[in-house]
Amino acid sequence: MRLVIARCSVDYAGRLTAHLPSAPRLILVKADGSVSIHADDRAYKPLNWMSPPCALKEGTGEEEGVWTVVNKAGEKLIITMEEILHDSSHELGVDPGLIKDGVEAHLQELLADRIDTLGEGYTLIRREYMTAIGPVDILCRDAQGGTVAVEIKRRGEIDGVEQLTRYLELLNRDPHLAPVRGVFAAQEIKPQARVLATDRGIGCQVLDYDALRGIEDDKLRLF
């Protein structure tokens, strides 16, 4: 991972346009090719970013100090450096991945056992389908025989959608599986995550933990 702290301005050109005026910012360039720009007041959420696969070109000559990031759709993130305060690279190695909490692990097990929760005619291929970047929670087929990758969270936020997006990009390269569509499943899905998922063609499924466990809601009982 490369970390750059710089005074810079940022312009995005794609389905819409956006501009970040000059200010000190943190730029992360990850091994997967993603580039994200961060301020000091938004927790983990970037001000702007470009998801992989994308290419970073650092300008030379008259273009020195201008970084251009282009993704496969032709969208551009142009970062104009005014002053670089820090620039370092670090080899983090292969991450062991997130260890799911008890509820998420149980949700995965329950949903695999009741895969028709996602729709009539769904069949399970396998849980923890391994890929080069980590395991997909559930891989299944819909009633039409299409492949579906399911990412399960207790609380569905943007980072979960990004994770599923990376899995889908990889799975769709496999001719034996493609086309693969995604379903983001959680007990609660944040509005921003739902908007991002919908924009990327990913379905959303709210999971009722008690219903999956076969526990009736007392409020629905008449006696």
UniProtKB/Swiss-Prot annotation:
It is found in: Cytoplasm. Its main location: cytoplasm. Keywords: Cytoplasm, DNA-binding, Endonuclease, Hydrolase, Nuclease. GO terms for cellular component: cytoplasm. It comes from the Bacteria. InterPro entries: Endonuclease_NucS, NucS_C, NucS_N, NucS_N_sf, tRNA_endonuc-like_dom_sf. GO terms for molecular function: DNA binding; single-stranded DNA endodeoxyribonuclease activity. The keyword DNA-binding applies. Its EC number is 3.1.-.-. Belongs to the NucS endonuclease family. HAMAP family: NucS. Cleaves both 3' and 5' ssDNA extremities of branched DNA structures. NCBIfam families: PRK03298.1 (NF002876). This is Endonuclease NucS. It comes from Streptomyces coelicolor (strain ATCC BAA-471 / A3(2) / M145). The gene is nucS.
